[in-house]
Amino acid sequence: VTKAIDKLEETEGTITIGGYDLAALTRADLAEAVVLVPQVPFLFADTIFHNICYGIKREVTLEEVREAARRASIDADIMQMPGQYAFLVAEAGHNLSGGQRQRIALARAFLRTPRILILDEATSALDNTSEKQIQVEFERMKEVYGTTILSIAHRLTTLKNLRSNCCDGPRKDRSTGHV
């Protein structure tokens, strides 16, 4: 599904989201409407502020970025770093933990408030407390902005609030965490 959304050609059938046929949309249309947060997010050598603002086409204030970071449970960590939002991220975020990298990418998504949010193991490096806080923000995003969220995950807790779900392979006992 993520490959189809990334504009690779389907061999048969169509994919529609919100009534739009993905094959009819341009890359620019997709970039505006869809945000993908992968398991290993793209971070570049620049400040945390600029990493969170990546892909935004408007002027963004520090307060907007901080609010997005709060929603992603990363603001407190950033405020402890030298330079705070001016802290320089190493190429690929190698001077940050895996969880910090994921939360920065999630802050980027919260700042953009997309129509469609695709989470591909986007919380796999987070502790349970952070994941629960971020799940609340996903719910808020759905309610306030009408965002459609497609979540690809192995952890059952990541999928518990979804309206519908599907599995690759036979379904097992959900109470054990095995699907």
Where are these regions (language model features)?
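Conserved beta-strand positions that form and line the central face of beta-propeller blades
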Residues: 16, 21, 77-80, 88, ...
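Helix-to-loop junction immediately C-terminal to a conserved catalytic motif
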Residues: 5-7
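Conserved ABC transporter NBD signature motif
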Residues: 10-20, 30
